[in-house]
């Protein structure tokens, strides 16, 4: 089949008016830097929430199914193992706040649209359009350039959910092929890892330096995110984050820090 690409500003109300029949919408049109969103709160609210509202309106009008991408960052500060039943979400950034708002909007429209909402962990892995603001990809770039890895010292032993692109693709494929639109929310991650574990992976393949920093987004508690709800109903998610680090460093192996 032919694939067509259209460049559209989805924040405009009529951006989708010429698309007459769309079976499934995958909404990836968001600014995604959680820490960076602190500096552009108004912009990210206007962009991300504006786009989401336009897409919801379109899906309702055209009866299109929606794959909604949320984030595990909606949990904020928690204790122990958290799952989708967690009632007290504590987002720590404008980006995460918007994801909570989007999920609430979906619940209000639960009888008007078919959807599935996925709370993605932090992405890792090689892609043609990859970005480098997420932890593992950023560390890979810095390591390749010989720069010190910017590490939040207070987070060294606190696990966080990470998602390999390989698993993300598997989720999209499964959802479409199995018509997995049951108007529910699922955590999507490959593994929970501490910064210490991630740094150990890097040390296997690269001589690295570390620079300790403080972040504006500091969680006081250590917690893990459960993926059992999705894996028990759908498919296993177990791609190796270490392999993502290895392949990313290999891809970046030819770059240097010369200007």
Where are these regions (language model features)?
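Glycine/proline-rich active-site loop of Rossmann-fold NAD(P)-dependent oxidoreductases
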Residues: 100, 124-138, 165-166, 174-186
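Amphipathic terminal alpha-helices
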Residues: 227-228, 239-259
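Conserved Rossmann-fold NAD(P)-dependent oxidoreductase catalytic core, especially the SDR/UDP-sugar
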Residues: 27, 53-94
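Mid/C-terminal beta-alpha module of Rossmann-like enzyme folds, strongest
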Residues: 139, 143, 171-218
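Glycine-rich NAD(P)-binding loop of the Rossmann-fold in SDR/ketoreductase-type enzymes
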Residues: 39-54, 89, 93, 97-98
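Glycine-rich Rossmann NAD(P)(H)-binding loop
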Residues: 123-127, 151-162, 184-193, 215-220, ...
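Conserved beta-loop-beta element that borders a ligand/cofactor-binding pocket
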Residues: 71, 103-127
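NAD(P)H-binding glycine-rich loop region in Rossmannoid oxidoreductase-like domains
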Residues: 7-47
């Amino acid at each position: 089949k032919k694939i067509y690409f259209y460049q559209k500003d989805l924040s405009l109300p009529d951006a989708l008016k010429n698309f007459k029949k769309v079976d499934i919408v995958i909404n990836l049109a968001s600014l995604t830097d959680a820490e960076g969103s602190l500096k552009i709160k108004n912009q990210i609210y206007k962009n991300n929430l504006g786009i989401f509202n336009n897409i919801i309106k379109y899906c309702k009008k055209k009866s299109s199914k929606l794959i909604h991408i949320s984030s595990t960052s909606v949990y904020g500060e928690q204790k122990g193992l958290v799952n989708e039943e967690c009632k007290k979400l504590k987002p720590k950034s404008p980006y995460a706040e918007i994801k909570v708002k989007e999920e609430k909007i979906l619940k209000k429209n639960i009888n008007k649209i078919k959807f599935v909402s996925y709370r993605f962990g932090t992405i890792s892995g090689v892609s043609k359009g990859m970005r480098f603001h997420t932890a593992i990809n950023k560390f890979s770039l810095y390591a390749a350039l010989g720069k010190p890895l910017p590490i939040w010292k207070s987070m060294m032993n606190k696990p966080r959910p990470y998602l390999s692109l390989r698993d993300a693709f598997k989720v999209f494929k499964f959802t479409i092929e199995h018509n997995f639109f049951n108007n529910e929310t699922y955590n999507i991650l490959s593994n929970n890892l501490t910064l210490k574990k991630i740094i150990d992976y890097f040390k296997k393949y690269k001589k690295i330096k570390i620079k300790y920093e403080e972040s504006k987004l500091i969680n006081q508690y250590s917690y893990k995110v459960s993926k059992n709800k999705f894996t028990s109903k759908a498919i296993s998610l177990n791609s190796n984050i270490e392999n993502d680090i290895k392949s990313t460093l290999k891809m970046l192996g030819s770059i240097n820090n010369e200007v």
